[in-house]
UniProtKB/Swiss-Prot annotation:
Phylogenetic lineage: Bacteria, Pseudomonadati, Pseudomonadota, Alphaproteobacteria, Magnetococcales
One Gene Ontology term, aspect cellular component: cytoplasm
Keyword rRNA-binding assigned: no
NCBIfam families: argC
PANTHER family: N-ACETYL-GAMMA-GLUTAMYL-PHOSPHATE REDUCTASE, CHLOROPLASTIC-RELATED, N-ACETYL-GAMMA-GLUTAMYL-PHOSPHATE REDUCTASE, CHLOROPLASTIC-RELATED-RELATED
Classification via CDD domains: AGPR_1_C, AGPR_1_N
Organism expressing this protein natively: Magnetococcus marinus (strain ATCC BAA-1437 / JCM 17883 / MC-1)
Similarity comment: family membership: Belongs to the NAGSA dehydrogenase family. Type 1 subfamily.
Encoding gene, per UniProt annotation: argC
Protein localization: Cytoplasm
Annotated protein name in UniProt: N-acetyl-gamma-glutamyl-phosphate reductase
Amino acid sequence: MGRTLRVAILGATGYTGGELIRLLHRHPGAELSFVSSERFAGQSIAKVYTHLQAVGHLICQPMDAKKACEAADFIFCALPHVTSMEVVPELLQRGAKVVDLSADFRLKSAETYAHWYGTQHLAPELLPQAAYGLPELFRESIKGANLVANPGCYPTSVQLPLFPLLQEGMIDPALVIADSKSGVSGAGRSPAQGTLFAELSEGFKAYKVEAHRHIPEMEQNLALAAGKEIKIRFTPHLLPQSRGILSTCYLRPTSGVNAQRVRDTLMTRYRDEPFVTVLPHGDMPATSDVRGSNACHMGVTEDLRSGWLIIVSVIDNLVKGASGAAVQNFNLMTGWDETTALDSLPMFP
């Protein structure tokens, strides 16, 4: 068991920040001591999020790295991309451990970051140091890290089923298709026309086709599993619901591989993982099965006519896809049991 640490959340009034507060409130090793928000500075967090009345004593402060480090030992950085890399170097220099929920430290190549995010990386020297924070795949490197790059939500839903199969040479790395659907909270809390109720309700659309910024993150990590470069065909879609990601992956199996072998491989790989469930033959997951939880459920089948494998995985984009994974990383970095504060059952209906 780890010790109790003072914890800060920078960018506490976005959806991931609010979800971090909800999860950390029940963590015996986390004392929330500092929350920041430029927009809501001076206001109670309960004024910003009325469901957080139990922590109404928390007052949003302007973003100040020095004050955050004076108030806390461990910092969750839930700031936007680019803003985060302006702040994280100072946090580390002041001795804080950091989980960063932006994309600023997920990619190992500063050139790749510049290509996909349209700006030069301001702290390229930190990229090799940042541990990629998907515990089921990179647990040991997370434990010893001072900086963890929390994964993107889509990559979490795709990498968990695909990584073991690429490691075992069970699927063709040249033929990987991921078709993903996300609830609108994945777009963040800032007002935008595309996320208005009238724009989303009773509709369903693809967006950023072949141009989503999570593509290089998936290709980088899946290439580690495959031992060679991989190009993924990835199409994200926006669902008219608040939470949840469902990813359908279409895969060409290698010789002698069928759905049962794939299911057995995934079951063996994740048998001792508390948050991953591989469903039995004939069952497929739904986003409602994991709502509000840190769980990932996946189902496996095959198209006998084409010979292709189909894997469906679901997560809650705000929990396993963001804040839940961040708390899981906090637990690993500070010596707490990995499931601490994350063992709640999903909400249904």
